[in-house]
From Swiss-Prot:
GO cellular component, one term: cytosolic large ribosomal subunit
Gene name as annotated: rpmI
The name this protein goes by in its record: Large ribosomal subunit protein bL35
UniProt record similarity statement: Belongs to the bacterial ribosomal protein bL35 family.
Pfam families: Ribosomal_L35p
Keywords: Ribonucleoprotein, Ribosomal protein
Taxon lineage: Bacteria, Bacillati, Mycoplasmatota, Mycoplasmoidales, Metamycoplasmataceae
Molecular function terms from GO: structural constituent of ribosome
BP GO terms, sorted: translation
Domain of life: Bacteria
Entry keyword annotation includes Ribosomal protein: yes
Alphabetized InterPro entries for the sequence: Ribosomal_bL35, Ribosomal_bL35-like, Ribosomal_bL35_CS, Ribosomal_bL35_sf
Organism whose genome encodes this protein: Mycoplasmopsis agalactiae (strain NCTC 10123 / CIP 59.7 / PG2)
Region (Disordered): 31-62
């Protein structure tokens, strides 16, 4: 059986660290920023670690 290909959409959106953690960008950043508070915009600049419950689903796609 051939190997499964990595999903290109996921490949563009996440990065796996050397220790195996999955880093993703924050959601809700692309538009409608005038409705968001300064604190929301500032905190969404940081990358976030993928939650363990989501990680189980995405391991099959990576």
């Amino acid at each position: 059986m051939p190997k499964m290909k990595t999903k290109s959409a996921l490949k563009k959106r996440i990065k796996v660290t050397a220790t195996g953690k999955v880093i993703r960008e924050q959601a809700y950043r692309s538009h409608l920023a005038q409705n968001k508070t300064t604190k929301q915009k500032r905190q969404s600049r940081k990358s976030a670690q993928m939650h363990s419950s989501d990680l189980k689903r995405f391991k099959a796609l990576i």
